[in-house]
Amino acid sequence: MQPIFWQWDGLTISSYAVCMVLGLIAGTLASLGEARRQHIESARVLDAILAASVLGVIAARLGYVLINWAYYQDHSGEIVRLWLGGLSWQAGLIGGSIGAWLVARRHPPAMLVLDLLAIGAALGICFGWIGSYLSATAFGKELFPGQPFFFLAIDAPDGYGQTNPRWPTQLIGAAWALLLFLALWLTRKRVWRVGARYWLFIAAYSFGAFVLGFTRGDDVLTVSGWRIDQILDALLFSTALIALVRLRLKRRPAPQPDAPAEASASQS
């Protein structure tokens, strides 16, 4: 663990903050690269990224604080200290999507821009998990000798600094996000329905996050024994799955009839 990236003469830069910046830069470059390939104006995408980043980070932090209220009710001074780590991907996705859509809808189709942002979001989330690993947030449950997956254990601290063999939850999350980014990037040249990549990303990542929730050791709100973040993952997965099915069932647009001039030319 290395929560402090750089420190000099009272100035401290956290590793989590560095990972956030790197994730934003890498995700932006990935989305812009795909936008150029599709001949979409870069300024349009950058405006959406800016709106998504601002609303997404605010929503993600608020969501994380609410989910982990058991900790923050006794550490209220840390709520605004974003650089210490702690973002909810579910709240960030909702807030970021709303921000991007509000900007992108001025030049429809808005979902086309969200498709581009999904590629960058996957890469950005990967850096976010690395930041969580370095800052000991979203840590894994303890593992004990004799348990089936003890061979995966790493010595890692929890939010209170207690180091024990734990699930490598943050590293698994980073690997899953990176895998999704590679899948979206390598298939970017195929023909996609507008909105398909966005919903596919949400479905795939929320499924992985739901499964990963069983390995997390941070104390969060629960409902009927289920972690609140897993409940949100399940809701996002269901929503994305319904959207994908609707896209699949949507009839392709009928071919347009030839223009009158073209029809006359063909008859002559």
Features from the language model and the residues they span:
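A feature for loop-to-transmembrane-helix boundaries and adjacent hydrophobic helices
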Residues: 1-268
